[in-house]
Amino acid sequence: MQDAAAVRTGKTMAVLKKTELVKARKLWEEVFEEDTAKFLDYYETYVADHNQIFAEEEAGDVVSMVQLNPYRVHMGEAEADSYYIVAVATRESCRHQGRMRRLLAEALQQMYQEKIPFTFLMPASESIYLPFDFVTVYRQSLFTCGVVIPGSNDNCWHCIPCRWEQLKELAEWSNVFLQNHSEISTVRTEDYYKRIWKEQESMNGQILLFYEGSQMKGYCFTGYEGSGEAWEIAVEADNPEEQTGSEPRAASDSQALANRRAVEALTRWFGGQDQLPMRICGFLPESYIDGIPLSEMTYRPMTMVRIVNLEAFVSHMRAKKPVQFVLYIKDPIIPENCGVFCFELGRECSSL
């Protein structure tokens, strides 16, 4: 992996020194005006030092770029390398010239050579990435709350800012939680949360932990830039078999109640900071919030993914029972993925 930025000038590839990455920041500031200098300082220090930046340059200025941030991901019980694509940007005067397509194709080809199973991104618009065979896999729920929502004294949750020395415990808890609720998730480590800690600080926020009494029930990330916001709200539901009256509670109802308690705790926390109204987003997919009508919720495409190296991706697939089938694959960006393939999937291993 390169530790600097790859720059395309005409047909020539060059490698920028890290001290020259200020060129990429200049374009970032032009295109993403909503990002603060404080956030970009964080990004340069804790992210850009180990990512890859594909760019096109004119007259010494970066005019188009695609950045790849490396991540380890859980794929079932195994782990794999992946990249999060971020800061896809082109100077306004240089748009509609095929620059983004060239850079994305270049980045995808390099990831293919690295045997990356898949890559992912947060789209500004789905329509931008559909032609590159990205598909949306997660739509984030969000709503705005302007008042403190009271909770029951019997099961009231409260928020406590995470301490630096708790980050290892948080990593262990969140890995278990995410693997219980998803086949694919980013690997959480103490170092991962140290970086997240710095990111939240750059957005005037922090990592909050949810507690019921002395028991930790989950976490979320927060920020404040004119209004409060909380996201990635990961909270553990009570036992699905617990009773409500004479009927057993469904798992989805149990999760909805946990989400409700988290919302109550968040409104009390932000209300105490005089930061209401606040935006709350990012619960578990397909879960809802007890007592909050669906009509008050909106949804936005949050995560799009694309298979990069088909063989590597299939090697991580598993089937409850052995299965074999043939597919014709057409990939407009990565020709190595094109052809007729026999898929052989099993409980322990899979292959093409």
Can you say where each PLM-predicted feature lies in the sequence?
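Short hydrophobic/aromatic beta-strand element in the GNAT-like acyltransferase core
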Residues: N51-A55, M65, A87, G205-L209, ...
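Conserved GNAT acetyl-CoA-binding A-motif
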Residues: L104, Q110-P123, G272-E286
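Conserved active-site alpha-helix within GNAT-family acetyltransferase domains
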Residues: Q113-P117, P123-S141, P285-M302
